[in-house]
From Swiss-Prot:
One Pfam family it belongs to: THF_DHG_CYH
Name of the gene this protein is made from: ADE3
Binding positions for ATP per the UniProt entry: 384-391
Compartments where located: Cytoplasm; Nucleus
Native source species: Saccharomyces cerevisiae (strain ATCC 204508 / S288c) (Baker's yeast)
Listed HAMAP family: FTHFS, THF_DHG_CYH
Pathway: One-carbon metabolism; tetrahydrofolate interconversion
Keyword Cell membrane belongs to the record: no
Gene3D superfamilies: Formyltetrahydrofolate synthetase, domain 3, Leucine Dehydrogenase, chain A, domain 1, NAD(P)-binding Rossmann-like Domain, P-loop containing nucleotide triphosphate hydrolases
Residue numbers of Phosphoserine PTMs: 176, 322
Residue segments, region Methylenetetrahydrofolate dehydrogenase and cyclohydrolase: 2-319
Reported effect, residue 144 to S: Cyclohydrolase activity is reduced 20-fold. Dehydrogenase Km is increased 7-fold
The name this protein goes by in its record: C-1-tetrahydrofolate synthase, cytoplasmic
A GO cellular component entry from the record: cytosol
Subunit architecture: Homodimer.
């Protein structure tokens, strides 16, 4: 009786059906799950085209997306590798297969080896083959044909363990890997090949024979005859891998397909045998589909796992060394390693040296299905001029969360300006054992974002003054128009910005030659009133001599002079736009909306009118990408944007927050806990915190889960009647000796800040930032007052001296607070009047009785209302050293009238800002300035900066 046919076609069909069902099942709870196989074919070989069609058809049946990339025969190796690299980096591509053979001019090994092992679903890359050949190896994928052979044997209930197997053929594609698989399943394996003498002698006692020698009917049927010549006790299972075409005049094609085994004879003597075609071939394709599914599931599972961010150990010293000494004593992680720990792909990362990099905002799109992590705002009580340690607390908190409690956490902070760094303020990287490293790179230039803001701002300023010059010196409309819209190669064309201006003016024309004289005048003349220009040039250095200058004094400017001045770069509205934009499109639209002046008819003139929107966006294209750095304990920090806290929101960017919240977020069905994003707002909560909620949260659509309010014994003593604290002078003894009475009186300021936070419906944790001279009695007084005022918790934190270890209790309190319900609401309705919004902030946040709007401020308010800008949120610029407008009023002043001296528009950023006093928007340098101590040694190490 003849043996039986082992039908690979039917088995493959069952596998494809099972794969399709499993995909549908997963999609039931993960709708976005879509296994994707990329197939690269170079050239037009008919056999390759046939195999590709088979794979695409099988993918369709299995519910797998097949992305077919067909390259011309002449494609260079560089081009093919570029496609492979793109697919390697594409998170939507789970498997990659390069159809072989490739044209002769291409190196197959180099190209196939370029495929990432995690996407090498063919299983033949060096990593997967290498792991397969190790005794305890762990390949990502088994090669498809050998895997299909094993599955066929299992399907036929063939016992592999303890069997004797003979493999005829030693190729890297089938022979060698199938031998390894059989061996790993405890079969005793003999490998033979075309040069082996008397192959038939090896087959008599074989239980399993795999033939992959590539020669038509090389193995004769009679080789399987039992030694005694009978046909009894047939036990051999034959797997024929061969695919050979031999002449057959009876076929229409003139050829027929045969295997490496003489099928018609062998079936007489064996138990099972695979046919050709219809045996191993369909199983190979089915295993390709199964490997693709495995890859997609593995990626899904990896994305659902909590982030693992191994900490860097700290060697704590007493007394605590200087910040720069601590920074240099710690060897940071390579930034690409930290990015990998965060789940950032290499194509989403742009390295700037070893320890800083930019992150593509496209991370947000890739992780769009994730639920955001927990969002924590760090703010403070009304500070002394020495500061109370918000940045240090931010770093200590994330170090505690990640390095000591195993919770993924990212700190999001502003980029410091060079001006204060080289002036009197020093760096802004935190301090002690809670800081960003390398701190010199953090404080100097970083990746050049501030310089990009400066270039963009100054281009705009130059464009405004130059436009006024050209309009004034060219009186004839037609002549001016011809120069504004010149002919190139005999044709005139509006730029995109010009076309947008035409549309806003209601001129629905696209051909420059079609405009009437009236339309030409309306379009070409901006008629800027020079007295209304709000844009100043900027520089990122403290330079008091630039506060007021006269431009246009060169003879070439024909007496077109104008008094103007410089701002520090971070005071530019473009910096606020960078901080508040949700994405590149939003940034471009905001830039276009910036009002630079009014025309002679009091109508607003925008960046879009000047024609600068595209150019400014181009200059800021890279600046919109957040910068990745790390803390002393190797936890991630995103550094992005640095709007001037005096007249702007004083917070890092919306984009950085959105990126970070997705990176530490969780997939909808994941059972892991979300991580934490800890950001901060400038000055005290009454200023930075209020702006954060009413301006930044309106722009981002995000709301914090908790607020950390930083308080110090020193600051509360200042508000409780202790002598003033002055920078550069020794602290009065009241601050270094126990004085609980001062603390208890000053605690009223903290309690007012707690009440202010609670008006937004968010839980608040008070962080008592510990100093060496603080006593237990003073700290206990603060905690008691905080809890009585409604704080969720009040915790002492010693992160400056101990790093994350010193902030563990604070981190635990923040975790608990962030799990409390939030009843968030804004302080005011943006659609209420400007006057009402100002009054609400002054009364509810500052404790004032009323506002006093000076005539010039009222004139501007009326103008902004007339121009349609009355429904914007409000930013109030005032002193940071008092809840009121008067820095000498400590504690919790009440009943005062708050002056509004001026109101200005930041339409691109999306707010009005009112000034309670004259604010210097470019600082000066002191007699002794920070830059005087800076030196650089022969190795490039910077000394004296901090």
């Amino acid at each position: 009786m003849a043996g039986q046919v082992l039908d690979g076609k039917a088995c493959a069909q069952q596998f494809r059906s099972n794969i399709a069902n499993e995909i549908k099942s997963i999609q039931g709870h993960v709708p976005g799950f879509a296994p994707n196989l990329a197939i690269i074919q170079v050239g037009n070989r008919p056999d390759s085209a046939t195999y590709v069609r088979m794979k695409r058809k099988a993918a369709e049946e299995a519910g797998i997306v097949a992305n077919f990339i067909h390259l011309d025969e002449s494609a260079t190796e560089f081009e093919v590798l570029r496609y492979v690299d793109q697919l390697n980096e594409d998170p939507h591509t789970h498997g990659i297969i390069v159809q072989l053979p490739l044209p002769a001019h291409l190196d197959e090994d180099r190209i196939t080896s370029r495929v990432l092992a995690e996407k090498d679903v063919d299983g033949f890359g060096p990593t997967n083959i290498g792991e397969l050949n190790k005794k305890n190896g762990h390949p990502f994928f088994l090669p498809c044909t050998p895997k299909g052979i094993i599955e066929l044997l299992h399907k036929a209930n063939v016992t592999i363990e303890g069997s004797r197997s003979v493999v005829i053929g030693r190729s890297d594609i089938v022979g060698s890997p199938v031998a390894e698989l059989l061996k790993s399943l405890n079969s005793t394996v003999t490998i033979t090949h075309s040069k082996t003498r008397d192959i038939a002698s090896y087959l008599h006692d074989a239980d399993i024979v795999v033939v992959a020698i590539g020669q038509p009917e090389f193995v004769k049927g009679e080789w399987f005859k039992p030694r005694d010549g009978t046909s009894s006790d047939k036990k051999t299972v034959v797997i024929d891998v061969g695919t050979n075409y031999v002449a057959d005049p009876s076929k229409k094609s003139g050829f027929k397909c045969v295997g490496d085994v003489e099928f018609n004879e062998a079936i007489k003597y064996v138990h099972l045998i695979t046919p050709v075609p219809g045996g191993v071939g369909p199983m190979t394709v089915a295993m390709l589909m199964q490997n693709t599914l495995i890859a997609a599931k593995r990626q899904m599972e990896e994305s659902s796992k909590p982030l693992q961010i191994p900490p860097l150990p700290l060697k704590l010293l007493t007394p605590v060394p200087s910040d720069i000494d601590i920074s240099r004593a710690q060897q940071p992680k390579l930034i690409n390693q930290l990015a990998q720990e965060l789940g950032i792909y290499s194509h989403e990362l742009e390295l700037y040296g070893h320890y800083k990099a930019k992150i593509s905002p496209k991370v947000i799109e890739r992780l769009q299905t994730r639920q955001n992590g927990k969002y924590i705002l760090v703010s403070g009580i009304t500070p002394t001029p020495l500061g109370e340690g918000k940045s240090t607390t931010t770093m200590g908190l994330v170090q505690a969360l990640t390095a000591h409690l195993g919770k993924p956490a990212i700190a999001n902070v502003r980029q410091p300006s060079l001006g204060p760094t080289l002036g009197v303020k020093g760096g802004a990287a935190g301090g002690g054992y809670s800081q960003v490293i390398p701190m010199d790179e953090f404080n100097l230039h970083l990746t050049g974002d501030i310089h990009a803001i400066g270039a963009a701002n100054n281009l705009l300023a130059a464009a405004i003054d130059t436009r006024m010059f050209h309009e004034t010196t060219q009186k004839n409309d037609a002549t001016f128009y011809n120069r504004l819209v010149p002919r190139k190669n005999g044709k005139r064309k509006f730029t995109p910005s010009m076309q947008r201006r035409l549309n806003r003016l209601g001129i629905q024309k696209t051909n420059p030659d079609d405009l009437t004289p009236e339309e030409i005048n309306k379009f070409a003349r901006l008629n800027i009133d020079p007295d209304t220009i709000t844009i100043k040039r900027v520089v990122d250095i403290n330079d008091r001599m630039l506060r007021q200058i006269t431009i246009g004094q060169a003879p070439t400017e024909k007496n077109h002079t104008r008094v103007t001045g410089f701002d520090i770069t971070v005071a530019s509205e473009l910096m606020a736009i960078l901080a508040l934009s949700k994405d590149l499109r939003d940034m471009k639209e905001r830039i276009g909306r910036v009002v630079v002046a009014a025309d002679v008819n009091r109508s607003p003139v925008t960046v879009e009118d000047v024609g600068c929107t595209g150019a400014l966006t181009a200059l800021l294209r890279d600046a919109i990408k957040p910068n990745l750095m790390q803390t002393l304990e190797g936890t991630p920090v995103l550094v992005h944007a640095g709007p001037f806290a005096n007249i702007s929101i004083g917070a890092s960017s919306v984009i950085a927050d959105r990126v970070a919240l997705k990176l530490v977020g969780t997939e909808p069905e994941a059972k892991t806990e979300a991580g934490y994003v800890v950001t901060e707002a400038g000055f005290d909560f009454t200023m930075g915190g209020e702006r954060f909620f009413n301006i930044k949260c309106r722009s981002s659509g995000l709301t914090p889960n908790a607020v950390v309010l930083v308080a110090t014994v020193r600051a509360l003593k200042s508000h409780g009647g202790a002598p003033d604290v002055k920078p550069g002078q020794p602290l009065p003894s009241a601050y270094t000796e126990e004085n609980i009475e001062f603390v208890e009186k000053g605690a009223a300021n903290m309690c007012k800040q707690i009440a202010n936070i609670k008006q937004f419906g968010v839980p608040v944790v008070v962080a008592i930032n510990k100093f060496e001279t603080d006593t237990e009695g003073e700290i206990a007084a603060i905690r008691k007052a905080a809890l009585e005022a409604g704080a969720f918790e009040a915790v002492t934190s010693n992160h400056w001296a101990e790093g994350g270890k010193g902030a563990i209790d604070l981190a635990k309190a923040v975790i608990e607070a962030s799990n409390q319900p939030v009843d968030f609401h804004f302080l005011y309705d943006v659609n209420s009047s400007v006057e009402d919004k100002l009054t609400t902030i002054v009364q509810k946040m500052y404790g004032g009785a009323a506002i006093d709007i000076l005539p010039e401020a009222q004139r501007k308010i009326d103008m902004y209302k007339e121009q349609g800008f009355g429904n914007l949120p409000i930013c109030i610029a005032k002193t940071q050293y008092s809840l009121s407008h008067d820095a000498t009023l400590k504690g919790v002043p009440t009943g005062f009238t708050f002056p509004i001296r001026d109101v200005r528009l930041s339409n691109g950023a999306g707010y009005l800002y009112a000034l309670a006093a004259e604010i210097q928007t470019i600082p000066g340098l002191a007699t002794y300035a920070g830059y005087m101590a800076v030196e650089v040694d022969d190795d490039g190490e910077i000394d004296g900066l901090f």
